[in-house]
């Protein structure tokens, strides 16, 4: 009897935890219109929309969507927002003129106009093509983008990502990094914004005045202004040339 009671209690506890999780999932999946000047149902070519005139404030996945005007397609669960558009999620802020929000995919799509992503340290990424997943807190940009850190140094590339949960920018394809004294070109670079640390990989080339250096990996400590290059390091100056396994540059 005691074993049966224990099993029953365990089963009920399991059901309760599943129920709480399901309720949380259901709450997170709902989009809530928190405020606006007006909201009304309209019919556009046979489709039902909620037309929202703002300033409007929506909430989804603990993320705020702000805009001047929005059309919310009830059937496809897509929100078209324009005018002073902002996405606010904890320490990450995205701003643009317009966006398309796919509710079932937790995805904010920015196309055409400039979109700006800024973290708590005022590292600022700008591009014209960006997707932001409000559930995973992950931004993906394509077709070119540039990030300026809080001190004005710039990293640019064809594509990349930003994971706000771990404060990590990733840049891929035709990556250029501009520092106060050194210019770096590489194929892939990761920038940990909370550590002020850039890590680069294969095919890295760096220039400082008339000096050139290449390697297949290394890092740059922004706070201490220190470069470290390793793996097939090749150095050329106007009068010398050398090879080594690793090299520090101050």
What is each of the regions a protein language model found here?
Residues 22-250:
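N-terminal amphipathic/hydrophobic interface segments
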Residues 1-9:
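Bacterial N-terminal signal peptides that target proteins for export
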């Amino acid at each position: 009897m005691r074993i049966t009671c224990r099993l029953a209690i365990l089963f009920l506890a399991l059901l309760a935890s599943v129920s709480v999780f399901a309720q949380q999932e259901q709450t997170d999946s709902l989009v809530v219109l928190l405020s606006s000047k007006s909201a009304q149902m309209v019919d556009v070519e046979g489709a039902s929309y909620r037309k929202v005139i703002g300033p409007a404030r929506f909430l989804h996945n603990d993320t705020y969507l702000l805009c001047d005007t929005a059309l919310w397609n009830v059937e496809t669960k897509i929100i078209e927002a324009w005018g002073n558009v902002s996405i606010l999620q904890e320490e990450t802020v995205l701003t643009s003129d317009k966006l398309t929000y796919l509710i079932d995919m937790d995805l904010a799509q920015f196309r055409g106009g400039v979109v700006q992503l800024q973290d708590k340290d005022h590292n600022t990424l700008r591009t014209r093509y960006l997707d932001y997943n409000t559930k995973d807190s992950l931004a993906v940009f394509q077709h070119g983008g540039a990030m300026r850190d809080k001190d004005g140094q710039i990293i640019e590339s064809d594509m990349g990502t930003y994971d706000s949960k771990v404060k990590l920018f990733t840049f891929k394809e035709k990556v250029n990094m501009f520092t106060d004294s050194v210019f770096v070109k590489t194929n892939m670079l990761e920038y940990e914004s909370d550590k002020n640390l850039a890590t680069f990989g294969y095919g890295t080339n760096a220039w400082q005045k008339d000096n050139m250096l290449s390697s297949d990996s290394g890092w740059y400590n922004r706070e201490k202004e220190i470069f470290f290059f390793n793996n097939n390091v090749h150095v050329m100056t106007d009068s010398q040339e050398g090879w080594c396994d690793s090299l520090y540059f101050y």
